[in-house]
A protein has these predicted regions:
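Extracellular structured ligand-interaction cores
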Residues: 51-53, 113
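C-terminal nucleotide
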Residues: 1-28, 53-89, 186-334, 349-389
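Short Gly/aromatic-enriched secondary-structure transition segments
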Residues: 40-47, 228-229
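Short, charge-rich binding segments
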Residues: 45-47, 55-58, 107-108
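Gly/Ser-rich oxyanion-binding loop with an adjacent helix/lid
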Residues: 1-23, 29-33, 39-42, 73, ...
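N-terminal cofactor/phosphate-binding cores enriched in small/glycine residues
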Residues: 33-35, 47-48
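FabD-like malonyl-/acyl-CoA
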Residues: 132-133, 345-349
Length: 389
């Protein structure tokens, strides 16, 4: 079992007495519907069978002792449940501490500390939501440990709240929602404006989902993410002078074409066009899957990437290379960047008999062009957070 070394590390660092729990929260990938979550549109993410493992034990004092097997050079990072605030030297522990703080803000005070060891098999900085996975995992552990009366959907909202207010990153709800609400074999058709959702089975006969990781490091906080949000807000404010909408996601393509001249900046107009068209693509993509039309789903994935490249301008040479090389290969049904962009990953649907050639050819072309290697993961769609032991 993947978690056994994590439990062994916990016992080595913190001893084996008391009630020790073993937990898992997945990572996520978004199949289509990118940069729509803060524009009141739809998304189509799913939880993965890779994610974050946590071993935790409640303490009878206020002390927090955190250790990550992914950042062993940092050693055990100690703090307290009293006076929680973000600190640069706290590094990755700002994510679990932020969730503890957020529980307190929502009227559920974490009264005692804990010992925690984490191990993630999500590639770090890949855009598969390692931070949101840690947030949902922390919330799930706190619920189990302290008996807080919260649903999995609440855990998603608390995770997002902590990332926004404690860590100062303007993320939407998708990452935490997909992780907290994951269901094996299904993606989540999520209306980000209302949080209404439905599960849609992903039936890929003779095909696999392949994640290609660019290995270009990026952080949400220092990317152009916030800039894109404000460009969309500017476009929305100008559109609202001529048409009654709450969000860009309220518009159809035809309505956008009718009213787009209200947006004075050509750049903001392009950003808004992506938000509107991507939302409509996502709705069509889910319909395509329901009709078992995987080929149409793949075409919409490809169109999504073109829009993210040309109208939203969040791809960059690394992601474009991965996708454009994928498009050349027989047996690739669809390929696009996924996540915030500027590095991170692509998601591709690849026929079973083409997977090996895909990894070899895309990998070689990428290394030749970018000068360092990409990593490839053939992934399965998994469930949300779980207590393993």
């Amino acid at each position: 079992m993947i978690w056994e070394p994590v439990l062994a590390k916990f016992k080595e660092l913190f001893g084996d007495e008391g009630e020790i729990g073993v937990y898992f929260a997945p990572g996520r990938v978004n199949m289509i519907g990118e940069h729509t979550d803060y524009n009141g549109g739809h998304e189509f993410p799913c939880a993965l069978t890779i994610g974050t493992y946590g071993v935790a034990r409640k303490r009878d004092d206020k002390k927090l002792r955190f250790y990550s097997m992914n950042f062993e050079n940092l050693g055990v990072l100690e703090s307290s449940v009293e006076g929680l605030k973000p600190e640069k030297e706290a590094d990755w522990t700002n994510y679990p501490k932020g969730v503890m703080w957020a529980f307190g803000e929502k009227g559920m005070k974490v009264e005692s500390g804990m010992d925690l060891v984490l191990f993630g098999n999500i590639p770090n900085g890949s855009g598969l939501s390692s931070s949101a996975s840690v947030e949902v995992l922390t919330g799930f552990i706190l619920r189990d440990m302290f008996g807080f009366d919260v649903t999995n959907q609440d855990l998603a909202l608390i995770g997002q709240y902590s990332e926004n207010k404690f860590n100062g990153v303007n993320c939407g709800i998708m990452d935490q929602f997909a992780i907290a609400m994951g269901k094996a074999g299904h993606a989540i058709f999520l209306d980000t404006a209302t949080l209404k959702y439905e599960y849609a089975p992903i039936k890929l006969e003779n095909a696999k989902i392949v994640i290609s990781c660019s290995n270009k490091k990026r952080g949400l906080g220092d990317s152009k993410y916030n800039e894109r949000r404000s460009e969309c807000e500017t476009a929305l404010a100008e559109l609202q002078k001529v048409v009654k909408i709450n969000a860009l996601g309220d518009l159809t393509e035809a309505q956008f074409e009718q009213y787009q001249d209200a947006i004075t900046s050509p750049v903001c107009r392009k950003r808004a066009k992506h938000a509107v068209y991507e939302n409509q693509r996502t709705i069509k993509a889910v319909e395509a899957l329901q009709n078992n039309d995987v080929a149409l789903f793949g075409k919409l994935m490809n169109d999504s990437h073109v829009s993210l490249r040309d109208d939203y301008e969040v791809t960059g040479i690394e992601l474009d290379t991965l996708v454009e090389e994928a498009w050349k290969i027989d047996g690739v049904i669809g390929s696009r960047m996924t996540g915030a962009g500027f590095g991170g990953c692509t998601v591709s649907i690849v026929k079973d008999d083409a997977v090996d050639a895909f990894i070899e050819k895309v990998g070689t072309a990428y290394k030749n062009k970018i000068s360092y290697a990409a990593d490839f993961y053939v992934v399965e769609i998994g469930d949300g957070p779980v207590k393993l032991a």
